[in-house]
Amino acid sequence: PKNGNSVVSTIDMQIQKIIEQKLKDFDDKIGSKVTNILVMNPQNGEILGMASSYPYNLNKPMDEKSLLSLYSQSEIDKMKAYTKQKQAEEATDSEDTSEDSKDSTKKKTDDQKTIYDAFNELWRNSIISDTNEPGSTYKPFTVATGLESGALTGNENYFCTGSLMVGKRNIGCSHVHGNITLKDAVAKSCNVAMMNIGFKEGADTFYKYQNIFGFGRSTGIDLPGETDTKSLVYNASNYSNSVTLATNAFGQN
């Protein structure tokens, strides 16, 4: 017999403890539909801490008390009743294969959930299973694209009036930055500068480096449920639309 492979976690318990407390503090004071915190080692991608809203006990994954962070007790009771009803219908349908019985199983509406649907929602790791626009965190990639491709020298200056007319759309910035250097455009998160940089790079280069940086590709994290993002990344023809290129340059669409 051979020993199995060693399993070593990269989680830093001190970091994990801190982010779980910070997440709880935020949800208690402000709250959101879902709150996520992820801490990575930027040198090698190791996960040092990962926490999401709606914790549950892995030793008791189907403890109904955990669902109270998502639903009221009355909602849970309704789902349990609906689950029993659905199970009874399915048991009947397994004995009766007529067309009428098949149609009876199609009456589930979007707002009806079984208790198992609720648990699946609770167990879902939204950090790896959900997608979000990167927003301003994409701006360094826009600048890096320009520097790597030679579209930028690093000595550029821009003028931000608080918005930029692109086609028939006036696309805004959070502030009127006035004259701004490339370095400050990143530091102050200037949308106007990023749009101008995107235009300077052009659709083909912008798309090329989006792929080089790994957007739309699987991370290969050793956790189940990572979402497929290939269809969320535009191709060069999409970026031929000036508004699309402009907004994607600062991480939105």
Question: PLM ranges: what are they?
Answer:
Residues 1-35, 43:
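Conserved, well-ordered alpha-helix/loop/beta-strand core segments that scaffold catalytic motifs
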Residues 19, 38, 48-50:
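Mobile, glycine-rich extracellular loop/lid and propeptide segments
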Residues 11, 43-136, 141-253:
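Beta-lactam-recognizing serine transpeptidase/beta-lactamase-like catalytic domain environment
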